[in-house]
Amino acid sequence: MKYAIMSDVHANPVALETALADARALGCEKFAMLGDVTGYGYDPKRALSLVRENFDIVLMGNHDSACLGLEQRQCDLNNPNYDLDRKCRGELSDDDAKWLRGLRPLRTVAGMALAHGDFTEPKEWYYINKPAVAAANFGARKEKLLFCGHTHRAEVWSLSREKIISRPSDRRLKDVPNAPETIEFKREKGARYIVNVGSVGYPRHDLCMSYAICDPSSGVFAIRRLPFDFGSYAMSMVSHGVDLPAWLLFLLFSD
């Protein structure tokens, strides 16, 4: 059974539709969403609708939690990262709010561990971004394959039989693709992996949308990368009255 594992849509339904069509064309049969359907983007209601219609497994992310008013420690400090979540909170239907409240930040599916952020304390939304942090996360779980999002950067951490941590994605995910590409990783005997699937709808670091493809019964998993139309995205933001973030303005108007 081939899974498409996506994360961080961030209220960008057009990007999500693109990723879904791509995954289906590649033969994916099951769909997992690792959270952050809301936040940052221009149409959270449409994004929520698409996720509810198309995904078999859905996790809660920190922005989904903030949309429900559950991240009070951060929202009460007027963190600008949660501005659109506070706005979305008043626009959610009762049914959508109830559905969101039923989501969890961590699940195990087909022998794979899935989380939005990290696996040590899933509700604290920590980033897996350093070898020591990756080591702690490997220690928190027993599964051979762990998938997460949250950082908006696709990458792969590995733990060998000799307990050596490396990041085999460093060179292979370096360049921004001009066309769709699939980067396959062969699982080595006795090794374990943390796979960050990147972001579908808000790729502020990778500058391309990405998601993971995995058949748990095989010895291969992959990062699928697609070009991202930043110009159209910016126009959608403006037409919905959403301020463009500084990183996007810099990207659009720098030489």
Question: PLM features: residue spans?
Answer:
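Beta-strand-turn-beta hairpins that frame and shape the catalytic cleft
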Residues: 1-4, 107-114, 187-194
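N-terminal active-site segment of His-dependent metallophosphoesterases
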Residues: 1-56
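Active-site neighborhood of phospho(di)ester-bond hydrolases with catalytic His/Asp-centered motifs
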Residues: 6-7, 31-36, 57-62, 115, ...
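Active-site environment of divalent metal-dependent phosphoester hydrolases
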Residues: 10-15, 39-41, 63-68, 120-122, ...
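Active-site neighborhood of divalent metal-dependent phosphoester bond hydrolases
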Residues: 47-48, 54-142
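Short beta-strand scaffold segments in enzyme catalytic cores
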Residues: 106-108, 154-158, 210-214
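Hydrophobic, aromatic-enriched interface-forming segments
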Residues: 138-168
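Acidic, His/Gly-rich catalytic cores of divalent-metal-dependent hydrolytic chemistry
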Residues: 161-255
